UniProtKB/Swiss-Prot annotation:
Location within or outside the cell: Mitochondrion; Golgi apparatus; Cytoplasm
PANTHER family, sorted: NAD(P)-LINKED OXIDOREDUCTASE SUPERFAMILY PROTEIN, NADH-SPECIFIC METHYLGLYOXAL REDUCTASE-RELATED
GO annotation terms (biological process): aldehyde metabolic process; carbohydrate metabolic process; daunorubicin metabolic process; doxorubicin metabolic process; lipid metabolic process
Gene name of this polypeptide: AKR7A2
Example GO molecular function: aldose reductase (NADPH) activity
The protein's name in its UniProt record: Aflatoxin B1 aldehyde reductase member 2
Disulfide bonding pattern of the chain: none
Length: 359
């Protein structure tokens, strides 16, 4: 007769056997390919500013050699120099057999608008600078609250019909505006937006609450800019720098510096970074990855981005060395759970003053 303990073990074994999939099912599961990785896009905002043409060419070459194919620029980047440099690289952008994809953007700033004439003028100027017949992705860089959105979207439809761009993208729009735009485009038979570019990183997660569900509903993929919070998540800055040495970068010495300081340069953000640094040391010891590496690994492995949806991270840089370090970080694996927990604590520390993702 079986003892009570034996009966318990036997029942457990039967229960496990009933729950375990048959060998062929296990083999099928093991043979499935891993889920698609979150993609990487090269952000070119510093080309023509802190990176000259040769440095920019080297960066693009290094990026493409890693197997990535998407480049991101804008009409306004470096007063047009970013597009001009990219156009001079001989990549054959916009050609039918070109494996490199290029995105640019029209904006409503500095005397421009998203009225039909301005949208057309900006895109056609961008095409001349890029030396290509069409761009793969054309963004509306931010809302133009002084122009009816129907006018802008109708203009985009005409430009798309003329073959000047393939996909339509949105950037810095509120979720309700995305819903309105998708509804208008669908009801009018106009080209629907398929990509949204927005601000997202380990300590800036406002997009998760309402925007991400909206994008999933309407089928837009998400491309994240500022994955390092403008460089703050490198850990190289100190809060006191704003009153002291003011190192050249996103936060000092350029026309967008004040915008970036207002976005991220807050005491709680520096406290949050210190918290992550402490967790990295505790989890990894002498072999601890940099804050930069950890922040990028969080984006690729622990954020709400999904490769299956076509989501991507936009990697900016101010030098080839910086780009190569960032690309190496994107190829590293997930973080230790304690570090992921520290990033979550860091987010809760700064969530109350998170900058809006929309403008």
């Amino acid at each position: 007769m079986l003892s009570a303990a034996s009966r318990v073990v036997s029942r457990a074994a039967v229960h496990c056997a009933l729950r375990s999939p048959p060998p062929e099912a296990r083999a099928l599961a093991m043979s499935r390919p891993p889920p698609p990785r979150v993609a990487s896009v090269l952000g070119t905002m510093e080309m023509g500013r802190r990176m000259d043409a040769p440095a920019s060419a080297a960066a693009v070459r290094a990026f493409l050699e890693r197997g990535h194919t998407e480049l991101d620029t804008a009409f306004m980047y470096s007063d047009g120099q970013s597009e001009t440099i990219l156009g001079g690289l001989g990549l054959g952008l916009g050609g039918g057999d070109c494996r490199v994809k290029i995105a640019t953007k029209a904006n409503p700033w500095d005397g421009k608008s998203l009225k039909p004439d301005s949208v057309r003028s900006q895109l056609e100027t961008s095409l001349k600078r890029l030396q290509c017949p069409q761009v793969d992705l054309f963004y509306l860089h931010a809302p133009d609250h002084g122009t009816p959105v129907e006018e802008t979207l109708h203009a985009c439809q005409r430009l798309h019909q003329e073959g000047k761009f393939v996909e339509l993208g949105l950037s810095n729009y509120a979720s309700w505006e995305v819903a309105e735009i998708c509804t208008l485009c669908k009801s009018n038979g106009w080209i629907l937006p398929t990509v949204y570019q927005g601000m997202y990183n380990a300590t800036t997660r406002q997009v998760e609450t309402e925007l991400f569900p909206c994008l999933r509903h309407f089928g837009l993929r998400f491309y994240a800019y500022n994955p390092l919070a403008g460089g703050l998540l490198t850990g190289k800055y100190k809060y006191e720098d704003k009153d002291g040495k003011q190192p050249v970068g996103r936060f000092f010495g350029n026309s967008w510096a004040e915008t970036y300081r207002n976005r991220f340069w807050k005491e709680h953000h520096f406290e949050a970074i210190a918290l992550v640094e402490k967790a990295l040391q505790a989890a990894y010891g002498a072999s601890a990855p940099s804050v930069t590496s950890a922040a990028l690994r969080w984006m690729y492995h622990h954020s709400q981005l999904q490769g299956a949806h076509g989501d991507a991270v936009i990697l900016g840089m101010s030098s080839l060395e910086q780009l190569e370090q960032n690309l190496a970080a994107t190829e590293e694996g997930p973080l230790e759970p304690a570090v992921v927990d520290a990033f979550n604590q860091a987010w809760h520390l700064v969530a109350h003053e998170c900058p809006n993702y929309f403008r």
